[in-house]
Amino acid sequence: MRYLFVALAVLLASTLVSAQAPAPVSGPLTRHYRDGETLTYRMTATNEDWHYTADVSGTAKKTVNGSTVEEFRWTGMTSNGQPIKLTPAMAQFRENLSLDPNWTPSAPDMGKTDPKMSGPILDFMTFYVDLWLVNKVGILQHAGDHFYVPNPQTSSWADGNQVIVGKDQIDFDLNLQSIDPVKQTAVVVVHHVPPSHPNLQLPAEWMQAPVADTANNWVEVKKSDDGKFEAGVGKETFDVTIIVSTADGRILSASMDNPVVTSSRTCDDAALTKCGVPQPHTIHRHIEIALVH
């Protein structure tokens, strides 16, 4: 099963914004934390032919520098309708996330997690860091406001073993789509789009040709068990929609659509020069979270 670690790109963008953004302004999306507050979410996801659910609960607590963080623990998972027993390491694993603009996001230690949970952990982080990014920028105050964040950096999910190369590059279009004063909710939409001129270092000449209607911004090379190389290139986008409580800034629900339009070849050599015919393919993931209590 192929994981697309889009959350890592969001972290890179958050680093850039942290260095450039002015002090955040309180607005309709501001998170008002209560120390000890606990939130529980249910994630429902489809990754091509794989369907899964996962449950996560987090408790708010103050950090030593005065910001607030939510310490999340993953409590359960089902795969294609069947309960999955998580590894003992997951009982100790904590995922620290926050919507406090004074906090700086960081990647979790994935070496201490159950491999089956990589997708849920990183996708959940994407929802949080996307909204954190909106709060950090601090200028989305009214329905229709938007802000574009160019991202010159690439993110990588290569592990050096099976995944030899795994990179993407995306820009961010932040939008405050609507505010409902009666329901006390706001709709935030974050479009993750290819840069006009990605600076990906593509490992083969045949990867330069655009697969879709933009320059390629996604590349992956995996080594198969028979010693061959599965190489693909293409266009990745994803759209995140977040329903936010304007009363306290909590995420009430969210969804993410993540299509990748690719062209892949099976190659005999690591230089990717002795390859078979191109095979078009579209990878599609859809993830939703909902606040349970």
Question: What is the meaning of each model-derived region?
Answer:
Residues 1-4:
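Positively charged n-region of N-terminal signal peptides that target proteins for export
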Residues 20-293:
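Signature of exported/secreted
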